UniProtKB/Swiss-Prot annotation:
Gene3D superfamilies, sorted: QueA-like
GO function term, MF aspect, one: S-adenosylmethionine:tRNA ribosyltransferase-isomerase activity
The protein's name in its UniProt record: S-adenosylmethionine:tRNA ribosyltransferase-isomerase
Functional description taken from the UniProt entry: Transfers and isomerizes the ribose moiety from AdoMet to the 7-aminomethyl group of 7-deazaguanine (preQ1-tRNA) to give epoxyqueuosine (oQ-tRNA).
Name of the top EC class for this enzyme: transferase
Protein EC: 2.4.99.17
Any GO BP annotation: queuosine biosynthetic process
Involved pathway(s): tRNA modification; tRNA-queuosine biosynthesis
Location within or outside the cell: Cytoplasm
Gene Ontology CC, one term: cytoplasm
InterPro entries: QueA (IPR003699), QueA_dom1 (IPR042118), QueA_dom2 (IPR042119), QueA_sf (IPR036100)
Assembly information from the UniProt record: Monomer.
UniProt catalytic activity: 7-aminomethyl-7-carbaguanosine(34) in tRNA + S-adenosyl-L-methionine = epoxyqueuosine(34) in tRNA + adenine + L-methionine + 2 H(+)
Organism: Gluconacetobacter diazotrophicus (strain ATCC 49037 / DSM 5601 / CCUG 37298 / CIP 103539 / LMG 7603 / PAl5)
Length: 355
Protein backbone atom coordinates (compact mmCIF):
# COMPACT_ATOMS: atom_id res chain seq x y z
CA UNK A 1 0.00 0.00 0.00
CA UNK A 2 1.45 3.36 -1.02
CA UNK A 3 2.73 5.73 1.65
CA UNK A 4 3.71 8.53 -0.72
CA UNK A 5 1.68 11.71 -1.14
CA UNK A 6 2.93 11.97 -4.72
CA UNK A 7 0.97 8.82 -5.57
CA UNK A 8 -2.21 10.83 -4.90
CA UNK A 9 -1.33 13.59 -7.34
CA UNK A 10 -3.20 14.17 -10.59
CA UNK A 11 -3.47 16.87 -13.23
CA UNK A 12 -6.51 19.13 -12.97
CA UNK A 13 -7.18 21.84 -15.57
CA UNK A 14 -7.82 25.13 -13.72
CA UNK A 15 -10.96 25.63 -15.81
CA UNK A 16 -12.60 22.74 -13.91
CA UNK A 17 -12.34 24.50 -10.53
CA UNK A 18 -15.84 25.77 -9.75
CA UNK A 19 -16.07 29.45 -8.80
CA UNK A 20 -19.83 29.36 -8.10
CA UNK A 21 -22.30 26.59 -7.23
CA UNK A 22 -24.84 25.09 -9.60
CA UNK A 23 -28.26 26.72 -9.56
CA UNK A 24 -30.48 25.19 -8.42
CA UNK A 25 -28.15 23.32 -6.10
CA UNK A 26 -29.52 19.88 -6.89
CA UNK A 27 -28.82 20.38 -10.61
CA UNK A 28 -25.12 19.73 -10.01
CA UNK A 29 -23.72 16.65 -11.71
CA UNK A 30 -23.32 13.42 -9.75
CA UNK A 31 -20.91 10.66 -10.77
CA UNK A 32 -22.25 7.34 -9.50
CA UNK A 33 -19.31 5.05 -8.72
CA UNK A 34 -20.44 1.51 -7.89
CA UNK A 35 -17.99 -0.89 -6.27
CA UNK A 36 -17.47 -2.52 -9.69
CA UNK A 37 -18.61 -1.98 -13.25
CA UNK A 38 -19.10 1.19 -15.29
CA UNK A 39 -19.50 4.67 -13.87
CA UNK A 40 -22.84 6.45 -14.37
CA UNK A 41 -23.23 10.17 -15.12
CA UNK A 42 -26.19 11.51 -13.15
CA UNK A 43 -27.33 14.71 -11.48
CA UNK A 44 -27.80 15.24 -7.76
CA UNK A 45 -31.59 15.21 -7.95
CA UNK A 46 -31.30 11.56 -9.13
CA UNK A 47 -30.09 10.62 -5.64
CA UNK A 48 -33.42 9.14 -4.42
CA UNK A 49 -33.36 6.62 -7.27
CA UNK A 50 -29.79 5.60 -6.41
CA UNK A 51 -30.59 4.77 -2.78
CA UNK A 52 -32.92 2.17 -1.26
CA UNK A 53 -35.88 2.39 1.11
CA UNK A 54 -34.48 1.96 4.60
CA UNK A 55 -31.13 3.58 3.83
CA UNK A 56 -30.18 6.36 6.25
CA UNK A 57 -28.63 9.64 5.14
CA UNK A 58 -26.31 11.17 7.77
CA UNK A 59 -25.52 14.87 7.22
CA UNK A 60 -23.32 17.37 9.05
CA UNK A 61 -25.38 20.21 10.54
CA UNK A 62 -22.50 22.51 11.41
CA UNK A 63 -22.87 26.16 10.35
CA UNK A 64 -20.00 28.25 9.00
CA UNK A 65 -18.83 31.29 10.94
CA UNK A 66 -17.06 34.30 9.37
CA UNK A 67 -13.76 33.13 10.83
CA UNK A 68 -11.19 35.48 9.31
CA UNK A 69 -10.38 38.50 11.46
CA UNK A 70 -8.15 41.52 10.84
CA UNK A 71 -6.40 42.07 14.18
CA UNK A 72 -3.85 44.55 15.48
CA UNK A 73 -1.13 44.28 18.08
CA UNK A 74 -0.21 47.90 18.46
CA UNK A 75 0.53 49.02 14.90
CA UNK A 76 1.30 45.51 13.65
CA UNK A 77 -1.35 43.85 11.50
CA UNK A 78 -2.11 40.22 12.37
CA UNK A 79 -4.38 38.05 10.22
CA UNK A 80 -6.37 35.60 12.35
CA UNK A 81 -8.38 32.58 11.19
CA UNK A 82 -10.40 31.00 13.97
CA UNK A 83 -10.03 27.23 14.00
CA UNK A 84 -12.07 25.76 16.86
CA UNK A 85 -13.46 26.63 20.25
CA UNK A 86 -11.81 24.82 23.17
CA UNK A 87 -13.61 23.36 26.21
CA UNK A 88 -12.65 26.33 28.41
CA UNK A 89 -14.18 28.85 25.99
CA UNK A 90 -10.90 29.99 24.44
CA UNK A 91 -10.30 29.71 20.70
CA UNK A 92 -7.52 27.99 18.80
CA UNK A 93 -6.66 30.05 15.73
CA UNK A 94 -4.12 30.21 12.92
CA UNK A 95 -2.26 33.51 12.74
CA UNK A 96 -0.25 35.15 10.01
CA UNK A 97 2.86 36.74 11.51
CA UNK A 98 2.31 34.54 14.57
CA UNK A 99 5.96 34.86 15.57
CA UNK A 100 5.27 38.47 16.51
CA UNK A 101 2.89 37.30 19.21
CA UNK A 102 3.65 36.46 22.83
CA UNK A 103 1.51 35.20 25.68
CA UNK A 104 -0.10 38.21 27.32
CA UNK A 105 -0.36 40.28 24.15
CA UNK A 106 -3.74 41.93 23.59
CA UNK A 107 -5.19 42.11 20.09
CA UNK A 108 -7.66 44.75 18.96
CA UNK A 109 -10.02 44.66 16.00
CA UNK A 110 -10.50 47.88 13.99
CA UNK A 111 -14.04 49.19 13.99
CA UNK A 112 -15.03 47.28 17.13
CA UNK A 113 -14.43 47.73 20.87
CA UNK A 114 -13.54 44.05 21.23
CA UNK A 115 -10.20 42.58 22.24
CA UNK A 116 -8.58 39.16 22.55
CA UNK A 117 -5.74 38.12 24.84
CA UNK A 118 -3.05 35.77 23.56
CA UNK A 119 -2.86 32.80 25.94
CA UNK A 120 -0.22 30.76 24.12
CA UNK A 121 1.51 30.25 20.76
CA UNK A 122 2.99 27.19 19.05
CA UNK A 123 5.65 26.83 16.37
CA UNK A 124 3.22 26.11 13.53
CA UNK A 125 1.32 29.40 13.44
CA UNK A 126 -1.27 28.38 16.02
CA UNK A 127 -2.38 30.60 18.89
CA UNK A 128 -4.91 30.29 21.69
CA UNK A 129 -7.02 33.42 22.21
CA UNK A 130 -9.43 34.50 24.92
CA UNK A 131 -11.96 37.02 23.63
CA UNK A 132 -13.57 39.62 25.86
CA UNK A 133 -17.07 38.47 24.95
CA UNK A 134 -18.96 35.22 24.39
CA UNK A 135 -22.35 33.83 23.44
CA UNK A 136 -24.68 36.03 21.41
CA UNK A 137 -22.39 39.04 21.83
CA UNK A 138 -19.48 37.08 20.35
CA UNK A 139 -21.66 35.97 17.43
CA UNK A 140 -22.58 39.61 16.80
CA UNK A 141 -18.88 40.56 16.90
CA UNK A 142 -18.06 37.89 14.30
CA UNK A 143 -20.89 38.98 12.03
CA UNK A 144 -19.62 42.56 12.20
CA UNK A 145 -15.87 41.99 12.01
CA UNK A 146 -15.38 38.54 10.47
CA UNK A 147 -15.07 37.44 6.87
CA UNK A 148 -15.81 34.00 5.42
CA UNK A 149 -12.68 31.89 5.07
CA UNK A 150 -13.38 30.73 1.54
CA UNK A 151 -10.94 28.13 0.22
CA UNK A 152 -7.97 29.73 -1.57
CA UNK A 153 -8.94 28.14 -4.90
CA UNK A 154 -12.18 30.18 -5.06
CA UNK A 155 -11.02 33.44 -6.63
CA UNK A 156 -12.47 36.49 -4.91
CA UNK A 157 -10.05 39.39 -5.53
CA UNK A 158 -12.19 41.73 -3.42
CA UNK A 159 -13.12 39.17 -0.78
CA UNK A 160 -16.18 36.95 -0.31
CA UNK A 161 -19.49 38.45 -1.39
CA UNK A 162 -22.84 38.53 0.35
CA UNK A 163 -23.95 35.85 -2.12
CA UNK A 164 -21.11 33.65 -0.84
CA UNK A 165 -22.60 33.89 2.65
CA UNK A 166 -25.73 32.29 1.20
CA UNK A 167 -24.01 29.87 -1.17
CA UNK A 168 -21.51 28.61 1.42
CA UNK A 169 -24.21 27.44 3.84
CA UNK A 170 -25.96 24.08 3.71
CA UNK A 171 -29.66 23.43 4.21
CA UNK A 172 -28.69 21.43 7.31
CA UNK A 173 -26.86 24.32 9.06
CA UNK A 174 -27.87 24.50 12.72
CA UNK A 175 -24.85 24.76 15.04
CA UNK A 176 -22.36 27.56 14.43
CA UNK A 177 -18.66 26.78 14.68
CA UNK A 178 -17.19 25.63 11.34
CA UNK A 179 -14.52 27.51 9.45
CA UNK A 180 -15.28 25.66 6.21
CA UNK A 181 -18.55 24.28 4.89
CA UNK A 182 -19.22 20.54 4.73
CA UNK A 183 -19.54 20.94 0.99
CA UNK A 184 -21.42 17.76 0.07
CA UNK A 185 -24.36 19.25 1.96
CA UNK A 186 -24.41 22.27 -0.35
CA UNK A 187 -26.20 20.21 -3.01
CA UNK A 188 -29.38 19.60 -1.00
CA UNK A 189 -32.63 21.51 -1.52
CA UNK A 190 -36.08 21.26 0.07
CA UNK A 191 -37.33 19.50 -3.08
CA UNK A 192 -34.55 16.92 -2.91
CA UNK A 193 -35.18 16.24 0.78
CA UNK A 194 -38.89 15.77 0.04
CA UNK A 195 -38.06 13.31 -2.75
CA UNK A 196 -35.76 11.36 -0.43
CA UNK A 197 -38.53 11.21 2.17
CA UNK A 198 -40.95 9.92 -0.46
CA UNK A 199 -38.43 7.26 -1.49
CA UNK A 200 -38.25 5.93 2.07
CA UNK A 201 -34.72 7.16 2.73
CA UNK A 202 -34.25 8.21 6.35
CA UNK A 203 -32.27 11.20 7.55
CA UNK A 204 -30.42 12.31 10.67
CA UNK A 205 -27.63 14.75 11.52
CA UNK A 206 -24.42 14.98 13.49
CA UNK A 207 -22.11 17.94 14.06
CA UNK A 208 -18.46 18.25 13.09
CA UNK A 209 -17.09 21.78 13.16
CA UNK A 210 -14.73 21.80 10.18
CA UNK A 211 -11.52 23.59 11.16
CA UNK A 212 -8.99 25.76 9.34
CA UNK A 213 -6.69 22.76 9.08
CA UNK A 214 -8.91 21.41 6.30
CA UNK A 215 -7.10 23.77 3.92
CA UNK A 216 -3.60 22.62 4.91
CA UNK A 217 -1.74 20.41 2.42
CA UNK A 218 0.21 17.26 3.17
CA UNK A 219 3.77 18.56 3.54
CA UNK A 220 6.53 16.37 2.19
CA UNK A 221 5.96 13.01 0.56
CA UNK A 222 5.46 10.81 3.61
CA UNK A 223 1.79 10.23 4.41
CA UNK A 224 2.71 8.52 7.67
CA UNK A 225 4.32 11.73 8.93
CA UNK A 226 1.18 13.82 8.39
CA UNK A 227 -0.84 14.86 11.43
CA UNK A 228 -4.45 16.00 11.17
CA UNK A 229 -5.72 19.01 13.13
CA UNK A 230 -8.32 18.17 15.76
CA UNK A 231 -11.95 19.11 15.08
CA UNK A 232 -14.85 19.19 17.51
CA UNK A 233 -17.70 16.75 16.94
CA UNK A 234 -21.01 15.69 18.50
CA UNK A 235 -23.20 12.66 17.86
CA UNK A 236 -26.26 12.68 20.10
CA UNK A 237 -27.76 9.55 21.61
CA UNK A 238 -30.79 10.07 19.37
CA UNK A 239 -28.64 10.09 16.23
CA UNK A 240 -26.61 7.08 17.38
CA UNK A 241 -29.82 5.14 18.05
CA UNK A 242 -31.22 6.02 14.61
CA UNK A 243 -28.05 4.85 12.86
CA UNK A 244 -27.85 1.59 14.80
CA UNK A 245 -31.55 0.89 14.20
CA UNK A 246 -31.19 1.48 10.45
CA UNK A 247 -28.25 -0.90 10.25
CA UNK A 248 -30.07 -3.59 12.26
CA UNK A 249 -32.99 -3.29 9.83
CA UNK A 250 -30.71 -3.86 6.83
CA UNK A 251 -30.38 -0.26 5.70
CA UNK A 252 -27.15 1.25 4.47
CA UNK A 253 -25.50 4.20 6.21
CA UNK A 254 -24.99 6.97 3.65
CA UNK A 255 -22.59 9.69 4.78
CA UNK A 256 -23.15 13.13 3.30
CA UNK A 257 -19.57 14.28 3.00
CA UNK A 258 -16.19 13.28 4.36
CA UNK A 259 -16.80 15.20 7.59
CA UNK A 260 -19.81 13.04 8.42
CA UNK A 261 -17.85 9.91 7.53
CA UNK A 262 -14.85 10.86 9.66
CA UNK A 263 -16.99 11.51 12.73
CA UNK A 264 -18.99 8.31 12.26
CA UNK A 265 -15.81 6.28 12.00
CA UNK A 266 -14.45 8.05 15.09
CA UNK A 267 -17.53 7.02 17.08
CA UNK A 268 -17.84 3.44 15.81
CA UNK A 269 -17.11 0.28 17.77
CA UNK A 270 -15.25 -2.51 15.91
CA UNK A 271 -18.61 -4.08 14.98
CA UNK A 272 -19.91 -0.79 13.53
CA UNK A 273 -22.12 0.17 16.47
CA UNK A 274 -22.21 3.96 16.84
CA UNK A 275 -21.76 5.42 20.31
CA UNK A 276 -22.75 8.95 21.34
CA UNK A 277 -19.75 11.23 20.88
CA UNK A 278 -18.79 14.64 22.26
CA UNK A 279 -15.16 15.58 21.80
CA UNK A 280 -12.34 16.10 19.34
CA UNK A 281 -11.32 13.86 16.47
CA UNK A 282 -8.14 13.94 14.42
CA UNK A 283 -8.78 10.71 12.51
CA UNK A 284 -6.71 10.37 9.32
CA UNK A 285 -8.25 7.86 6.91
CA UNK A 286 -6.00 6.59 4.14
CA UNK A 287 -5.65 3.38 2.11
CA UNK A 288 -5.41 0.40 4.41
CA UNK A 289 -8.08 1.70 6.80
CA UNK A 290 -10.92 -0.76 7.49
CA UNK A 291 -14.27 1.04 7.53
CA UNK A 292 -16.75 0.15 10.26
CA UNK A 293 -19.66 2.58 10.03
CA UNK A 294 -20.33 3.84 6.49
CA UNK A 295 -21.53 1.98 3.39
CA UNK A 296 -22.05 4.79 0.87
CA UNK A 297 -20.41 8.22 0.65
CA UNK A 298 -21.61 11.30 -1.21
CA UNK A 299 -18.79 13.80 -1.58
CA UNK A 300 -17.39 16.47 -3.88
CA UNK A 301 -14.25 16.09 -6.00
CA UNK A 302 -11.14 16.82 -3.97
CA UNK A 303 -7.70 18.36 -4.39
CA UNK A 304 -4.68 16.41 -5.62
CA UNK A 305 -2.44 15.14 -2.79
CA UNK A 306 -5.11 16.03 -0.22
CA UNK A 307 -6.09 13.94 2.79
CA UNK A 308 -9.63 13.88 1.40
CA UNK A 309 -8.55 12.30 -1.88
CA UNK A 310 -6.65 9.76 0.21
CA UNK A 311 -9.86 9.11 2.15
CA UNK A 312 -11.96 8.41 -0.95
CA UNK A 313 -9.21 6.13 -2.28
CA UNK A 314 -9.39 4.22 1.00
CA UNK A 315 -13.18 4.00 0.73
CA UNK A 316 -13.68 2.96 -2.88
CA UNK A 317 -10.23 1.66 -3.85
CA UNK A 318 -7.12 3.45 -5.08
CA UNK A 319 -7.26 2.30 -8.71
CA UNK A 320 -11.04 2.77 -8.80
CA UNK A 321 -10.77 6.40 -7.69
CA UNK A 322 -7.89 7.16 -10.05
CA UNK A 323 -10.10 5.92 -12.89
CA UNK A 324 -13.14 7.82 -11.60
CA UNK A 325 -11.24 11.10 -11.34
CA UNK A 326 -9.79 10.59 -14.83
CA UNK A 327 -13.36 10.10 -16.10
CA UNK A 328 -14.52 13.23 -14.25
CA UNK A 329 -11.72 15.36 -15.70
CA UNK A 330 -12.27 14.05 -19.23
CA UNK A 331 -16.02 14.66 -18.99
CA UNK A 332 -15.73 18.19 -17.58
CA UNK A 333 -17.02 17.68 -14.04
CA UNK A 334 -16.56 20.72 -11.80
CA UNK A 335 -14.20 20.28 -8.84
CA UNK A 336 -13.89 21.37 -5.22
CA UNK A 337 -16.21 23.16 -2.82
CA UNK A 338 -18.66 24.71 -5.31
CA UNK A 339 -18.31 21.84 -7.77
CA UNK A 340 -20.08 18.60 -8.63
CA UNK A 341 -20.39 15.47 -6.51
CA UNK A 342 -19.85 11.74 -6.65
CA UNK A 343 -21.58 8.82 -4.96
CA UNK A 344 -19.14 6.16 -3.76
CA UNK A 345 -20.08 2.62 -2.85
CA UNK A 346 -17.61 1.14 -0.40
CA UNK A 347 -15.22 -1.44 -1.78
CA UNK A 348 -16.05 -4.75 -0.05
CA UNK A 349 -13.34 -6.47 1.96
CA UNK A 350 -12.62 -10.20 1.94
CA UNK A 351 -15.53 -12.23 3.26
CA UNK A 352 -18.01 -9.34 3.10
CA UNK A 353 -21.26 -9.51 1.17
CA UNK A 354 -21.92 -6.95 -1.55
CA UNK A 355 -23.34 -3.60 -0.49
Amino acid sequence: MTDLASDFDFDLPPALIAEHPARPRDSARLLDIPAAGPFHDRIVRDLPSLLRPGDLLVANDTAVIPAQLDARRGEARIGITLDRILPDGTWHALARNARRLRAGDVLTFPGTPNTAAVISRDDEGGVVLRFDTEGAAFDAFLQAAGVLALPPYIARPFGPTEQDRVDYATIFSAHRGAVAAPTAGLHFTPDLLAALDAAGVGRCTLTLHVGAGTFLPVRGDSIAAHRMHAERGVITAETADAINAARRAGGRIVAVGTTSLRLLESAADPDGTIRPFDGDTAIFIRPGYRFRAVDVLMTNFHLPRSTLFMLVCAFAGYDRMRDAYAHAVADGYRFYSYGDACLLHRAPVAGEQGL
